[in-house]
Amino acid sequence: MFDKLEDLLIRYEELMSELSEPDVANNPERFRKLMKEQSDILPIVEAYKEYKQCKQNIEDSLAMLEEESDEEMRELAKEELNDAKNRVAELENELKILLLPKDPNDDKNVIVEIRAGAGGDEAALFAAEIYRMYQHYAETKNWKTEIMECDDTGIGGMKSVTFMITGAGAYSVMKYESGVHRVQRVPATETQGRVHTSAASVAVLPEAEEFDVVINEGEIKWDTFRSGGAGGQNVNKVESGVRLRYIWKNPNTGVAEEILIECTETRDQPKNKERALARLRTFIYDKEHQKYVDDIASKRKTMVSTGDRSAKIRTYNYPQGRITDHRINYTIYNLAAFMDGDIQECIDKLTVAENTERLKESEL
């Protein structure tokens, strides 16, 4: 591990030197590439530098204890020695986690699909609340959210909604939300006061870039149509809605299937086409990486972020004001704040659980 850390320290110094060269500054593509590499290894370098300083502090404190006869100074040295030893242990664990292979999708934007499960209007209302929860959470992270497709009930619920979250590291955080979310509460329409259970499923997909998948755009069949919704004469006269059909062969199964995607969210047909293509790329990328996801799921016992969308991951119990995440057996009692987007504490616990799991799998 320490040989690798020394190599990274040397590489960081090389990058700093290269970035200061005029020819690099005049080459935007190379400059961006080097800046990305530098920012990726900076947290490791900073932690390792602190680790080395703490090791030096331990040596200095031990030397002081051998040489110093003044009792007050010896006590100070003992205190500094203890602090340095504790920090070294913490940093060793941090460095092991920082050296774990990074998920190649972690830096990507995400496309989130929320679908109401069984439960009629109540399930659709819960799906809409889950959407708003993520919307509010995204605001706290300074991320941008944009609806791509929505099937609303007209009474505040959503049968389904697909939206994009754009922001640094969105997938690294949102990937923990894939799965079935279950709600237990008394619906507004319930006259007997009985608690009902309904659910919504969430799929979080890393947005695929154009170079991530191969699509023969000449084989896409496009249809246009008048999109429904509020907003004046444009809705009736302009065919801004788009529908694409694309035959795709799954490389993992060898089976060909037709992909159908509609986009009606804007009154700008080119923009709707662009969004439909983005969803097509993401769908194919997700399917092509399913084997990788399945392999991870088969190896891991806790399934913190395997992407298994059929797994029941969380229960929202309104009568008790309780949220329980079943993957890590974690319960909190701040449901109102949680539904308003205060989910970071839960995300942090899931991140720690996954890193612990990955450390067990690694040889570090």
Tell me what each language-model feature is:
Residues 90-364:
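Ribosome-associated translation termination/rescue signal centered on the conserved GGQ peptidyl-tRNA hydrolysis loop
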Residues 1-110, 356-364:
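Charged, heptad-repeat coiled-coil alpha-helices that serve as long linker/dimerization "arms"
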